[in-house]
């Protein structure tokens, strides 16, 4: 069952224009996802299908920090671009010409300071507010710099990285007077959490643990004391609805990743298991209190966590606007929920090759689970790298479509039963990637109608796509590929209408802004290996180049 959606809802929906404040209608790109709604949409339309062939580099900036490429989304506020490299070097640039205004070098973590994955430095974003620039570090600190000078103003430890094995790779989310951040280490033997700090001082405001403690509601979904080491870290950036005053986050997988003998209290896989892992949660922004949850993958045995972006949209239903969210997990299942209550409204599956389940019922239950077994070789599709990686999809209110890069890669692994060691990797398996069978192209950038669950168009690509998508009011969709091509597609048809070779593979996120009435499209360029190195090795003829460059494109005056 590839497309599952309640027909009565789908037939009752119509698109009525922007309807809702997208937060990126002005010249700036102030948040990781463009706005707090996480659309990755720019309302600027100076660059469009009629003139894009004239689009050319306006300026290029080399960070000089090439380790792990450039994975971030640049932020632009009041004509200044703020950028962080994978190793947490922060730059402020004149967004009109790329000139460096200041630079801050965050010291690398000492060897052995963390218990595992957090020793890999891969900062993916920052945010700006209250005259400060906020970012997280691989040694699990949240840092605030002076926005004008780059001087450190405050620095707080979210937790002891040596104990939890965790760090911070995602961009923080600024909500009112607080900065909210999760942490990586979803595969570590620790208890994941979201933390809010007061933006001006760094003082702790609240902390919400993904896994309920002893005596708390939901703890009964864990076996014994496995909740203490159950992972679930929300390792990407969330969203915020100011009208409801709720933050929305996707949570990580349960640990250990591929074996549940120590953590699943029941063999009944139709029930919620290991709450609140592999879920979308809504929390009260002021207190961190859980308002509602929806678990997408109960008893996750495939490392199919739900940590990706949560896209908030208002759509007309039976003559009235309904407040929705769309969320894609690593599995490629895309859920549409009522964001006020968490009510399930529909789900559709995006990968073309899928064998981890046989389908989904009309009420969102997984059926035909193909579960890895200890000591046995398991093959399943998509792989734990995800049908979509952490790089974000986009939503255009002009077309009403979601745009997502999808990869067709499978995995082979053999789970083991091992005891947890606090703060250390708790995956309990080695893993090999495999090309999905019967394929010529191993990825595709798709446009999906989130209401009907139907694919509107698909742009095929021979290898893998691991960069975010940008949609604009010029009815354009931008992304980059590992060979270094930065491309633009027609948002309504999927036709490729422009490209530029940047010289290095794309792993980060393009964005758009305006300075002095001139629209820019900026993209990071620079490949990161890490886990995706295993994906690249599937394609011996794929030549991937590293780098750490921002290329900002604009139209010449005659074409504007």
Walk through the language-model features, giving the residues of each.
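Extracytoplasmic beta-rich repeat domains
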Residues: 61-73, 103-127, 152-171, 188, ...
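Beta-propeller blade signature
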Residues: 145-150, 192-204, 267-288, 337-342, ...
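Phosphate/diphosphate-binding loops
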Residues: 311-351, 355-356, 372-383, 388, ...
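Loop/turn-rich, solvent-exposed surfaces of beta-rich toroidal or solenoidal domains
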Residues: 314, 406-408, 437-495
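N-terminal cofactor/phosphate-binding cores enriched in small/glycine residues
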Residues: 41-159, 471-472
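Blade-level signature of beta-propeller repeat domains, shared across WD40, Kelch, NHL, RCC1
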Residues: 511-560
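Blade/loop signatures of beta-propeller domains
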Residues: 20-57, 210-217, 366-370, 434-435, ...
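Repeat-blade elements of multi-bladed beta-propeller folds
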Residues: 29-33, 69-89, 115-142, 165-191, ...
């Amino acid at each position: 069952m590839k497309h599952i959606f309640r027909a009565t809802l789908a037939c009752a929906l119509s698109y009525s224009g922007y309807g809702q404040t997208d937060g990126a209608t002005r010249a700036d790109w102030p948040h990781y996802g463009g706005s707090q709604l996480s659309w990755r949409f720019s309302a600027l339309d100076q660059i469009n299908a009629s003139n894009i062939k004239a689009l050319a580099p306006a300026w290029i900036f080399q960070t000089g920090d090439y380790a792990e490429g450039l994975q971030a989304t640049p932020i632009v506020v009041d004509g200044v671009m703020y950028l962080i490299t994978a190793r947490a070097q922060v730059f402020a640039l004149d967004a009109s010409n790329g000139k460096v205004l200041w630079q801050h070098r965050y010291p690398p973590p000492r060897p052995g300071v963390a218990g595992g994955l957090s020793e890999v430095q891969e900062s993916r974003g920052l945010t700006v507010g209250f005259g400060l620039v906020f970012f997280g570090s691989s040694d699990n600190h949240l840092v605030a710099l002076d926005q004008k000078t780059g001087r450190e103003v405050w620095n707080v430890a979210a937790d002891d990285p040596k104990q939890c094995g965790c760090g911070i790779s995602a961009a923080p989310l600024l909500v009112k007077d607080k900065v909210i951040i999760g942490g990586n280490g979803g595969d570590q033997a620790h208890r994941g959490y979201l933390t809010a700090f007061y933006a001006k001082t760094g003082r702790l405001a609240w902390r919400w643990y993904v896994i309920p403690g002893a005596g708390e509601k939901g703890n009964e979904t864990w076996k014994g004391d496995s909740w203490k080491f159950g992972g679930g870290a929300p390792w990407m950036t969330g969203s915020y609805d100011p009208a409801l005053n709720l933050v929305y986050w996707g949570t990580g997988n349960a640990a250990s990743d591929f074996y549940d003998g120590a953590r699943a209290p029941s063999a009944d896989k139709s029930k919620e298991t290991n709450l609140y892992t592999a879920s979308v949660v809504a929390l009260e922004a002021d207190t961190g209190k859980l308002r509602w949850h929806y678990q997408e993958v109960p008893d996750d045995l495939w490392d199919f966590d739900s940590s990706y972006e949560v896209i908030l949209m208002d759509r007309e239903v039976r003559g009235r606007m309904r407040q929705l969210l769309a969320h894609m997990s690593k599995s490629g299942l895309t859920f549409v929920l009522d964001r006020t209550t968490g009510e399930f409204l529909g789900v559709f599956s995006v990968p073309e090759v899928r064998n981890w389940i046989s389908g989904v019922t009309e009420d969102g239950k997984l059926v035909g689970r193909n579960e890895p077994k200890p000591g046995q070789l398991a093959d399943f599709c998509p792989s734990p790298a995800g049908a979509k990686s952490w790089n974000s999809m986009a939503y255009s209110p002009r077309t009403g479509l979601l745009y997502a890069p999808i990869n067709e890669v499978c995995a082979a692994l053999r789970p083991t039963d091992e005891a947890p060691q606090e703060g250390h990797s708790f995956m309990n398996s080695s893993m090999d990637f495999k090309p999905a069978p019967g394929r010529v192209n191993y990825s595709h950038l798709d446009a999906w109608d989130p209401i009907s669950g139907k694919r509107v168009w698909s742009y095929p690509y021979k290898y893998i796509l691991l960069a975010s998508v940008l949609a604009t009011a010029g009815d354009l969709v931008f992304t980059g590929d590992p060979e270094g091509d930065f491309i633009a597609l027609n948002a309504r048809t999927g036709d490729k209408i422009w490209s530029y070779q940047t010289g290095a593979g794309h792993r980060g996120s393009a964005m758009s802004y305006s300075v002095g009435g001139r629209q820019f499209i900026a993209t990071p360029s620079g490949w990161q290996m890490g886990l995706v190195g295993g994906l690249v090795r599937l394609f011996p003829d794929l030549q991937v180049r590293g780098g750490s460059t921002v290329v900002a494109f604009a139209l010449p005056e005659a074409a504007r």
